[in-house]
Amino acid sequence: MAEISATAYAVQVDDLTLAYRQKPVLWDVDVRIPEGVIEAIIGPNGAGKSTLLKAIMGLLPLASGEVRVFGRPFSKERRRVAYVPQRSAVDWDFPTTVFDVVLMGSYGSLGWILRPGKREKARAREAIEEVGMGAFLDRQISELSGGQQQRVFLARALVQDADLYFMDEPFQGVDAATEQAIVTLLKTLKGRGKTLLVVHHDLQTVAEYFDRVLLLNVRVIAEGAVVSAFTEEYVQRAYGGRISSTLFPRGNKEDVHDARAHASVL
């Protein structure tokens, strides 16, 4: 596999370890995500998938390791990153409208002193239309379905016009129409040169939705192009041998980072 310079990686993680009450949650994690790809993080419950996103964004203290975004510390590139959290992490009863939630996405570029102007408000309306929620502009978010709520948060991320998007289980609990809308949005963002890192749980759609995959179970099991890394061997190792063998495309291992090359594997 051809070498890629550090500055060509959207995300580079080296030797990251994170513990909670002295129990490792992530252990000796290395990640390399090239720019302009859609990469899934998959693994069983408790594997550390959401934790890895938060660790990269500096939301959790590291026991050791280094994180770089576009070749620099995350704190230096924070404004180039957008985050879509799990729906369960959001207080949907907060009294605010669809438009106001999406408009919040502009605060990162404006700061907390400047107020959104005509340009920002027009972009918020455009993003709401882009995710198919134009008819719900003034609707309270508490009145929306789960799929509609997810679309609103995707619109807020669009307003940020980030270069790197972190999405934590965006497909969880949504209807089929919303799922396809999310897939279309991911591919649209990729077409604009954006990079997307998505925590994902449905193994049946990995090969269809993503370019690359990171298999995680406290440690990195493998990372690379879907055709190379999403194989029966690596997935069974990540999930403890509990997965049907009918899921996997036949590929090669030329473009895959195998954790066994430099560390012990679960």
Curated annotation (Swiss-Prot):
CDD domains: ABC_Metallic_Cations (cd03235). One of its GO terms (biological process) is zinc ion transport. InterPro entries: AAA+_ATPase (IPR003593), ABC_transporter-like_ATP-bd (IPR003439), ABC_transporter-like_CS (IPR017871), Metal_Ion_Import_ABC (IPR050153), P-loop_NTPase (IPR027417). SMART domains: AAA. ATP binds at G43, P44, N45, G46, A47, G48, K49, S50. Keywords: ATP-binding, Ion transport, Nucleotide-binding, Transport, Zinc, Zinc transport. GO terms for molecular function: ATP binding; ATP hydrolysis activity. It comes from the Bacteria. Residues 11-243 form the ABC transporter domain. Belongs to the ABC transporter superfamily. This is Zinc transport system ATP-binding protein TroB. It comes from Treponema pallidum (strain Nichols).
